[in-house]
Regions:
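C-terminal beta-strand-rich structural cap/linker in extracellular carbohydrate-active enzymes
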Residues: 706-729
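Acidic (Asp/Glu-rich), glycine- and aromatic
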Residues: 102-104, 117-191
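Beta-strand-rich recognition/accessory modules
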Residues: 7-9, 188-313, 339, 577-586, ...
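Acidic-aromatic substrate-binding/catalytic surfaces of carbohydrate-active enzymes
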Residues: 2-99, 111, 151, 163-165
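Carbohydrate-binding surface patches
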Residues: 216-221, 643-686, 690-693, 697, ...
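Aromatic-lined carbohydrate-binding/catalytic grooves of carbohydrate-active enzymes
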Residues: 320-460, 467-473, 479-492
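Glycan-recognition surfaces
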Residues: 415-444, 450-453, 503-614
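Aromatic- and carboxylate-lined catalytic core of secreted/periplasmic carbohydrate-active enzymes
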Residues: 589-664
Length: 729
């Protein structure tokens, strides 16, 4: 008997497969009877979608479909189903795949498992390459045309891009024409996207957002959910090796709706066998918090032995933030401050509530120019002047951090020629990977951290800065923000035959740094779970994406014990940042406060400083003081987002603390007040002690309340910032 579809179920999830080629035609949550795979993307094959290089030309690698199979029966896959009592397994063997529709000698085996009573489906892929062509990347599993419920516009997609990106109506949003503006600062032309983060349209008409892990992608999962339906779809790869991968979301747009979700692997396989690690597609109730909880548990079961459990110094835990000075030597040799200015800059920071300075542009040829020439610039003063200034700050209980770029090598300096040739990441065609920042003609080679001599030099340079110059923290720019790359350099023996070893190089760097200077906390740009538990703080830079759905709560909730740092910006005199960013100055400040971020306060003379914006400086000073009181009295706490908060605005967040919870509240001027109360679900005691602090009054106001009907109601004072500690009695 002919069956057009093959069915697999465990009573929780059902999967429907095309009986001819094994593609997924149905992905169903049985409790709602909703098939999420509602639209078949005709021109974009599902289940497996890769790139293979044939005669050095990139071609789409897919499973064969009816037109190819009808012409060549040897392409017919063998599909085996095992339907048990409350469980099921499918195995699909493809003797050949197709590259741009043409048969290629690459076989694939797909295995799908549904375990009893489990909302998670497990997916596995193995490849055998006999073609002699390189399989560079492979998206698996790839399910297309997804939406939940009746209306795709009511769906929301969570992508952990730089801590988190929330995208309503992803079908429409991914296909929107990008709205871009340019802001000029010095010789930098900063591009900002407004309204949505743009996707890239490929030759099949697919709008795709692809983010590498590491490099933009903070965690290896996505979640598509519908608040109207109360359900969601979660996708991840349980990546035990933490190798370079990517997540991607795609659509054909609102006139051909639905979203595709996939995990990108990078086999870089020219011959032989390759196997994926376990991937998961799951249905769940509720919103993205289920997905974050699920991912956290899986990562805790698979800790990174290189980067996990790095102790953060007590001084850093008690510090509210730092003041960042990029205005020593700018690109092109423009000098604002010298080493003799450091004591005065520290005193100014102290007046704002900070005792931690970050200094960039301290090195030969300055910021965004003299990389990696990491010795103090003699144009800024003597080494002794620098040492003395730092020693005096430390004697006062302060701290100094130096900016170091972990990625770039200026190709314009003759002394960098050998480093460039030896350590630069190389494209597949043998060309060097080159990047540009700032002025036209200032070009940088992208250095491969899996090249040992570069890693050794960087560790030695930072060790010198700690042991000789006296800094007690270091910031590694671009480490987890700039995209990871594939390196095909034939002389990089440490990762020979493995172009996708980017993450492993940085794991080794951080491990070697901690061994060399264990007393020096590490901060870096970007945010990624591969390295995050092994550093003091991760810079998320919401300031660059305030208008495109940036949502740092996603990472903070998933890994609440890790410290995020975020940039603050004055309302006026914001030459460094665009006007639409400056208009969100207070929102950025208060958002950083309620999610417990380590403040990153710029102080660039005339270009970006709170000291010329007196009213906003006073607002920041009060916020920093309240944050300091929070840390001194309760510590960081464990971030729980809006858990158990039945009535609360966007800028109200909950933390677990010893013997109770802490609630951080903010009201941003210019935004509508979201009510006068916060209602907390409480079943821990019949009475509670409430301790309140505000930005205007750091003296605790304490009262005791009876718990009524399992709830605690907090009346918000007429103030912009407040903290409530609710503790059991």
């Amino acid at each position: 008997m002919y069956h057009s579809r093959l069915f697999l179920t465990n009573g929780v999830i059902s999967v429907e497969l095309d009986s001819l080629n094994g593609e997924v035609l149905g992905f169903i949550r049985e409790s709602t009877m909703d098939n999420a795979a509602k639209n078949y993307f005709r021109d974009a094959a599902g289940i497996l979608d890769g790139i293979v290089y044939v005669d050095n030309a990139a071609k789409h690698l897919n499973v064969p479909r009816f037109p190819q199979i009808s012409e060549d029966a040897s392409l017919t896959p063998k599909i085996t189903l095992e339907q048990g009592e409350g469980s099921g397994k499918a195995e699909i063997f493809y003797p050949y795949l197709v590259a741009n529709g043409e048969k290629i000698d690459i076989s694939a085996k797909v295995r799908i498992e549904l375990l009893p009573g489990d909302c998670r489906s497990r997916w596995y892929l193995s490849l055998d390459n006999k073609s002699g062509c390189e399989i560079q990347c492979c998206k698996f599993p790839q399910l297309n045309g997804l939406w939940l419920g009746d209306d795709w516009k009511e769906n929301t997609l969570i992508i952990p891009r730089v801590a988190g990106l929330k995208m309503d109506d992803p079908t429409g949003t991914l296909a929107e024409p990008p709205v871009r503006m340019t802001w000029k600062w010095q010789e930098y032309l900063h591009n900002y996207f407004l309204g949505s983060q743009p996707a890239t349209k490929d030759d099949r008409g697919l709008y795709e957002m692809k983010v590498n892990h590491t490099g933009g992608c903070s965690m290896l999962w996505m979640d598509l959910y519908s608040e109207a339906e109360g359900t969601g779809i979660y996708i991840t790869c349980r990546d035990r090796d933490l190798r370079q991968k990517a997540i991607s979301a795609c659509t054909l747009g609102p006139y051909n709706p639905g979203v595709g979700l996939g995990i990108d692997h990078f086999p870089c396989l020219t011959e032989g066998a390759w196997e994926s690690q376990e991937c998961v597609l799951a249905f769940h109730e509720g919103d993205w918090h289920w997905a974050a909880d699920e991912y956290r548990v899986a990562r805790q079961e698979n800790p990174n032995p290189v980067c996990d459990n790095e102790p953060v110094p007590e001084w850093f835990k008690k510090s509210p933030g730092l003041v960042a000075h990029y205005d020593f030597m700018y690109q092109g040799g423009k000098v604002v401050h010298t080493f003799k200015d450091i004591p005065a800059l520290y005193e100014k920071a102290k007046s704002q509530g900070y005792k931690h300075l970050l200094i960039a542009g301290w090195n030969d040829h300055g910021f965004d120019d003299g990389f990696p020439l990491y010795r103090p610039s003699t144009e800024l003063g003597t080494e002794e002047e620098l040492k003395t200034a730092i020693a005096d700050i430390k004697a006062d209980g302060g701290h100094v951090c130096f900016y170091v770029n972990s990625r770039l090598c200026n190709v314009g300096y003759p002394q960098n020629k050998e480093r460039t040739e030896k350590s630069c990441a190389m494209n597949r065609d043998g060309s060097l990977k080159i990047e540009n920042y700032g002025a036209k003609g200032v070009d940088f080679a992208t250095l491969c951290m899996s090249e040992p001599s570069w890693r050794k030099q960087l560790v030695e340079d930072i060790t010198y800065l700690v042991k000789e110059i006296g800094i007690d923290s270091v910031y590694l720019d671009q480490l987890a923000m700039a995209t990871s790359v594939l390196c095909y350099h034939p002389e990089h023996k440490e990762h020979a035959g493995d172009p996708a070893a980017w993450n492993q190089g940085y794991e080794k760097l951080l491990d070697e740094l901690r061994a060399a200077v264990p007393e020096c906390p590490i901060l870096y740009e970007g945010c990624c779970d591969v390295f995050g538990s092994g550093v003091a703080a991760q810079l998320i830079s919401t300031i660059r994406r305030p208008a495109v759905g940036a949502m740092a709560e996603i990472y903070k909730y998933t890994f609440p014990e890790q410290i995020l740092t975020d940039m603050l910006n004055p309302r006026r005199y914001s030459a460094m940042r665009a006007e639409h960013t400056a208009r969100k100055s207070t929102w950025l400040l208060y958002k950083s406060f309620v999610i417990g971020s380590y403040f990153w306060c710029y102080d660039l003379e005339e270009d970006n400083t709170f000291s010329r914006d007196r009213s906003q400086e006073e607002r920041m000073r009060k916020t920093v003081a309240l944050r300091q009181a929070w840390l001194d009295r309760w510590g960081h706490g464990i971030f729980r987002d809006r858990e158990d908060l039945l009535v609360a605005g966007e800028l109200v967040k909950k933390y677990d603390i010893e013997n109770g919870v802490l609630i951080a509240c903010a009201e941003c001027p210019g935004y509508p007040r979201e009510g006068n109360n916060v209602v907390l679900k409480w079943n821990r005691s019949k009475k509670v002690k409430i301790t309140m602090l505000t930005a205007e009054n750091l003296t605790p106001v304490v009262k005791k309340l009876k718990v009524k009907d399992g709830f605690v109601r907090l009346n918000l004072p007429q103030t912009e910032l407040a903290l409530f500690a609710v503790e059991e009695l």
